[in-house]
Structure formats: structure tokens, C-alpha cells
A protein has these predicted regions:
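Beta-strand-connecting loops/turns
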Residues: 142-143, 187
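Feature captures eukaryotic membrane-trafficking machinery centered on endolysosomal pathways
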Residues: 145-148, 157-158
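PPIase-associated folding chaperone regions across multiple families
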Residues: 2-60, 68-127, 131-134, 148-151, ...
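Short clusters of hydrophobic/aromatic residues that line enzyme substrate/ligand-binding pockets
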Residues: 165-168, 181
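Short, surface-exposed, charged loop/turn segments at secondary-structure junctions
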Residues: 141-142, 166
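Gly/Pro- and small hydrophobic-enriched strand-loop and loop-to-helix capping segments
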Residues: 155-165
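Surface-exposed, Lys/Arg-rich phosphate-binding patches that contact polyanionic backbones
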Residues: 135-139
């Protein structure tokens, strides 16, 4: 473990407490919590950043008003004060990660760029090859729109969205879909193809390439931070496991 991040378990736990955590698979998350607290202990963030962090949290959890917030707190079994502390903690983690890994963020982005592509596409799935061919020719000849045909014939959930899927990460769906979408042109309609048990007709609506903005930079820094934390936790557990299993003289 890094010299700057040592943990004296005796200051946190009795032997019974340690045993309880291990037996209930909580030890790893416990050590992680201590390490994160140590790492961000000297990080200070402005009131503006705190407010922004809470607003982002509300937005991402679709909390629009006080009533929504009250419901969220009730189902989460936490108080507003506890929620605010957790949001501030996460904001400090992001700030720490940005300060420490800022110079590595672009390299990680370039390595992850392909996986971060977003896509919007239209899809119709049917178990019948003949029907898939008929659908394809109707769209190609503009006899009927893909949206209308999706509602009529698609056997997947996309029938409820008029065939439209996305924006979603291009890697979210079937790997073969991602491969096809990457080589298609905007507006291009695929001929029927077999995907598992489905015959599919697909059209690329939009491919969204990621850009290295501040949000993405923060995401890359946070990913590197998470990896380092996991490595530190695993290293700590391994070393302590070796100590406990070492023969006594």
C-alpha cells in the first residue's frame, strides 16, 4: 500500500467487528471507505461547487421539487443532511481525482474513445425472414415509413418507441449491432440480417462521437481514481491475509 495511506484496523474495529465484516463480505467496502476518506480529507471545495454537485445529483435522479426529494429520501432511508454529506463527498472525490490524474485523462480518453461512442438508430425485429424482407422493401420504396412498420410488426420493445433506440452507448447492444452501426452511413438502411433468433432491419439515425470536454475529463479522472482505489484495497487485503496466515515462531 502507498506509504501515505496506511490503516490501523485496531483503531476502527474489535476482533469481533472485523470477523463480522469478513463473514458478511463487507470488509472490502469498509477498507475502501476508509481509504477514500483519507485521500479526500484535505480536499476543500467552494460553496459554488457544492451547490452545483447537488443540482447535478437532483437532475440525474429526476428530482424536480421538494416533494420528489422527500420521496427519494424516504425510499433511500436517509436524511437530507446525510444526502448532502454524501453528495459533497462525491464532489470531493471528483476534485481529488482531477487534481491527481488530470495529466492522464486525455490518454485514457483516447484509449476508451471507441467505447464511448453514442448512437441513435431505428430497429425492427421479427422472427420471420419473409416479413423482414417485405418490411425492408416497403421502407426502401417509401411505401411505408419505418416508424409505422415498427409499430405494426416489430416483436421487440422498440415497437413502443416507433423503432427508435437511443441515444445509447454503441457498445450497449449486441456486439454485431455495434460492428454494423460503425460502418453504416447516416440514414443508411440495412438489408435484413439475422441476430440471434431475430431477423432485423436497421437504419442509422446518428452516430455521436465523444469529445474531450470537462465532463469527459472528470469521468476519465474518476475511472483512474476508482482503479487505484481498488488496487490499494486489494493490496491491503492481500498483505493482511498473508500476515494472518504466516506461521508464528
Amino acid at each position: 500500500m502507498d506509504k501515505g495511506y496506511t490503516i490501523d484496523l485496531n483503531s476502527f474495529l474489535t476482533n469481533d467487528g472485523l470477523k463480522f465484516l469478513i463473514e458478511n463480505n463487507l470488509f472490502k467496502s469498509f477498507i475502501k471507505s476508509i481509504l477514500v476518506a483519507k485521500m479526500i480529507s484535505e480536499v476543500e471545495i467552494s460553496d459554488e461547487l457544492k451547490t452545483q454537485a447537488f443540482q447535478n445529483f437532483m437532475l440525474s435522479n429526476k428530482i424536480k421539487n421538494e416533494n420528489d426529494l422527500k420521496k427519494f429520501l424516504e425510499i433511500s432511508y436517509i436524511t437530507q443532511s446525510e444526502l448532502e454529506k454524501d453528495v459533497i463527498k462525491q464532489a470531493k472525490v471528483i476534485e481529488f481525482a482531477k487534481r491527481k490524474y488530470n495529466n492522464k485523462a486525455n490518454t485514457r480518453f483516447l484509449a476508451r474513445r471507441k467505447d464511448m461512442e453514442m448512437v441513435v438508430y431505428s430497429l425492427i425485429r421479427t422472427s420471420s425472414h419473409e416479413l423482414a424482407k417485405e418490411i425492408y422493401f416497403k421502407i426502401e420504396s417509401e411505401e411505408e415509413s419505418l416508424e409505422e412498420l415498427a409499430i405494426k410488426y416489430s416483436e421487440g420493445n422498440e415497437k413502443y418507441s416507433r423503432g427508435i433506440i437511443g441515444p445509447v452507448p454503441i457498445t450497449q447492444g449486441h456486439p454485431n449491432l455495434a460492428d454494423k452501426l460503425r460502418v453504416m452511413q447516416k440514414g443508411e438502411l440495412s438489408e435484413p440480417f439475422l441476430l440471434d433468433k431475430w431477423w432485423c432491419v436497421m437504419r442509422l439515425e446518428k452516430l455521436i462521437n465523444p469529445s474531450f470536454n470537462e465532463i469527459v475529463k472528470s469521468q476519465m479522472c474518476k475511472e483512474i481514481f476508482d482503479e487505484e482505489i481498488n488496487n490499494l484495497v486489494n493490496s491491503f487485503i492481500q498483505k493482511n491475509s498473508n500476515k494472518n496466515s504466516a506461521p508464528t515462531k
